[in-house]
């Protein structure tokens, strides 16, 4: 993910430069709440901030539930602790002491109906050598990987081909389906065949731009060295801790309604909600998914609307389960599922293994739904639970009888960063009037970050 969720720019002016008092923020997810917080931090009590969101609670795809006396995130569950944005925001809000890290155990990959160690020394699953994926792919693929540095490379600087096309051409299809896809399906709910290399592996693309003679060389250039501390972080108490603090600091008016349309009104805007009420504002921040932004931008920014409408989206469902303490799961943090396996889930997170035991409950999460399928929309809750238990039996050989189950569906919530995505994002911003801004996970990165 990128820093876009943490900075709101109006009319080309940097964060913190605001001339008006009434602000309407459409969307109460993390992007909308951070936007409201930034406005409040810049203007103090002079700002009148209204957040529109029809959901039963604020937070968008960040959603914390209680299971077995513990907080469990059933939307996004982690951020990249080695990036500066979230730790800096937590420190700014006085929450640095609530940051926690993973236990350090790694996940596995389920491929060819077997469990394998997650490949080491890769970038987004792209191998640095045949040894890094040995055992996961066949001998012919290993030979192709070993020979890749000696094959001529055609690379156009600045281009953004699908990561899957590049990896399949240079290393073979098995590397795509068994090493790259399991990682990307968790982030995008999509496949490498539909995600641009600059979104999925930006450092590799940059290394190729600057003269790496092969993809192997590009990966070796950018492999992270020995970095202290865990890669992923979370919050003690779940993301609800962050959401509550943002709301407390931003002190917005929350209108539990959708926005129907936005019209120019003098130098400002008239924001009409779905109850028919109109709210005047000097500036508006649209922090809703791309498909909703496309509809709301049709009148005030038609070129931006057309670009936003081009961004494909996926849906996902998450099932969190509490099972009997001592259930004999393996010590790893979970399982990422390769493309084409006969499972319903795309990932299994052994929450207690990943984050450490916080009580006597054994917690896990099952994720369902990929780009192009309708599982998140159509599968009933009891069907998801049956699939989850079946998959656990298939993968681990364990019969699980959940004590408690919580599920949630994220419909059209996962944008697909198709080749050329950055250009689409730039076009959306370029077409905006000066006092209309956008924010969200379809612009600069899907992470928190």
Residue ranges and their predicted role:
Residues 68-155:
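Dinucleotide-binding Rossmann-like beta1-alpha1 core, especially the glycine-rich loop
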Residues 82, 169, 287-288:
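Short, well-ordered coil/turn residues at beta-beta hairpins
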Residues 260-378, 382, 394-395:
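Mid-domain catalytic core of redox enzymes
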Residues 16, 21, 64, 119-121, ...:
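Conserved flavin/dinucleotide-binding core of flavoenzymes
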């Amino acid at each position: 993910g990128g820093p876009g969720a943490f900075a709101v720019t109006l009319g080309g002016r940097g964060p913190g430069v605001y001339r008006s008092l009434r602000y309407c923020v459409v969307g109460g997810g993390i992007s909308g709440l951070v936007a409201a917080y930034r406005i409040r931090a810049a203007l103090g009590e002079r700002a009148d901030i209204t957040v529109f969101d029809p959901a039963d609670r604020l937070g968008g795809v960040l959603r914390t539930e209680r299971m077995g006396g513990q907080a469990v995130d059933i939307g996004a569950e982690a951020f990249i602790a080695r990036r500066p944005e979230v730790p800096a925001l937590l420190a700014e809000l006085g929450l640095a002491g609530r940051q926690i890290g993973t236990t350090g155990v790694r996940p596995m990959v389920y491929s060819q109906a077997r469990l394998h160690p997650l490949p080491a020394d890769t970038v987004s699953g792209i191998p640095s050598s045949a040894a890094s994926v040995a055992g996961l792919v066949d001998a012919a693929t290993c030979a192709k990987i070993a020979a890749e540095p000696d094959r001529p490379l055609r690379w156009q600087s600045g281009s953004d081909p699908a990561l899957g096309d590049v990896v399949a051409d240079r290393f073979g299809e098995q590397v795509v389906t068994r090493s790259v896809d399991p990682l990307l399906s968790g982030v995008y709910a999509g496949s490498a065949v539909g995600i641009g290399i600059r979104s999925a592996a930006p450092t590799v693309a940059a290394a190729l731009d600057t003269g790496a003679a092969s993809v192997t060389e590009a990966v070796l250039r950018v492999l992270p060295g020995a970095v202290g501390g865990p890669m992923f972080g979370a919050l003690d108490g779940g993301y609800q801790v962050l959401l509550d603090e943002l709301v407390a600091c931003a002190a917005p008016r929350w209108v539990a309604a959708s926005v129907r349309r936005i019209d120019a009104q003098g130098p400002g805007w008239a924001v009409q909600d779905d109850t028919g009420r109109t709210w005047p504002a000097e500036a508006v921040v649209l922090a809703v998914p791309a498909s909703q932004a496309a509809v709301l931008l049709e009148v005030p920014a038609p070129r931006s609307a057309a670009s936003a409408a081009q961004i494909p989206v996926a849906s996902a469902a998450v099932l969190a389960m509490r099972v009997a303490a001592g259930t004999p799961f393996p010590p790893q943090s979970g399982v990422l599922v390769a493309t084409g396996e006969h499972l319903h889930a795309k990932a299994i997170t052994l929450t207690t293994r990943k984050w450490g035991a916080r009580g006597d409950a054994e917690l896990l999460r099952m994720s369902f739904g990929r780009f192009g399928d309708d599982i998140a929309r159509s599968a009933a809750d009891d069907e998801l639970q049956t699939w989850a238990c079946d998959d656990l039996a298939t993968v681990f050989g364990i019969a699980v009888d959940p004590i408690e189950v919580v599920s949630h569906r994220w419909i059209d919530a996962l944008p697909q960063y198709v080749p050329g995505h950055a250009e689409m994002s730039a076009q959306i911003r370029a077409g905006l009037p000066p006092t209309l801004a956008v924010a969200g996970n379809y612009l600069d990165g899907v992470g928190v970050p």
